[in-house]
């Protein structure tokens, strides 16, 4: 619910549908000045979302920009074979991790700028203001979970044992909207 409310308020969706499985660049795709990708773990080869679309392969090459993209691994040998071509086709590259910049150079011979996580572009005061506007307040003491990838059910009992009765907030649980409501 909170994600939908955020989308309705802040995201202006186009009426056109991008056919991500097609190699065709529809005319409207070419009408944009730039296509930007970048997110936490967007290029992690262990994630199912690390497809050609995460590397903007549907967009005209000259309009591709990677802004603070994250690979989230340190071993170049775990990269998918296509990564060299896909990353090499992005003319403007910035990544979050120093090691990611090194990997890009190893794979493509290109340099990538290291740029901070975009959430750090917001001041502490702004973050505090948004937290104060939250409709639901967090308990005074709680444990936070943030698991990359798929968390297996077998870890649930271990988590409950370790947090010793504290409230548990799973930041990647899209169904736990009570912690995602902001004014």
Can you say where each PLM-predicted feature lies in the sequence?
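Aromatic- and Gly/Pro-rich donor/ligand-binding loops
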Residues: 1-85, 132-133
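Catalytic donor nucleotide-activated moiety binding site of glycosyltransferases and closely related
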Residues: 69-72, 103-104, 147-183
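A short helix/loop element that forms part of the nucleotide-sugar donor recognition site in Leloir-type
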Residues: 126-137
């Amino acid at each position: 619910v909170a994600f939908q409310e955020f989308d309705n308020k802040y995201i202006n969706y186009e009426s056109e549908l991008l056919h991500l499985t097609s190699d065709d660049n529809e005319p409207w795709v070419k009408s944009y000045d730039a296509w930007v990708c970048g997110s936490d773990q967007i290029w992690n080869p262990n994630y199912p979302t690390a497809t050609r679309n995460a590397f903007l392969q549907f967009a005209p090459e000259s309009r591709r920009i990677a802004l603070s993209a994250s690979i989230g691994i340190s071993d170049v040998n775990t990269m998918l074979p296509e990564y060299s071509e896909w990353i090499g086709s992005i003319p403007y590259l910035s990544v979050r991790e120093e090691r990611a910049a090194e990997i890009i150079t190893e794979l493509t011979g290109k340099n990538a700028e290291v740029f901070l996580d975009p959430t750090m572009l917001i001041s502490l005061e702004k973050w505090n203001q948004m937290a104060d506007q939250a409709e639901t307040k967090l308990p005074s003491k709680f444990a936070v979970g943030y698991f990359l990838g798929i968390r297996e059910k077998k870890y649930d009992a271990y988590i409950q044992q370790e947090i010793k009765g504290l409230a548990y907030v799973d930041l990647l649980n899209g169904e736990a909207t009570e912690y995602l409501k902001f004014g």
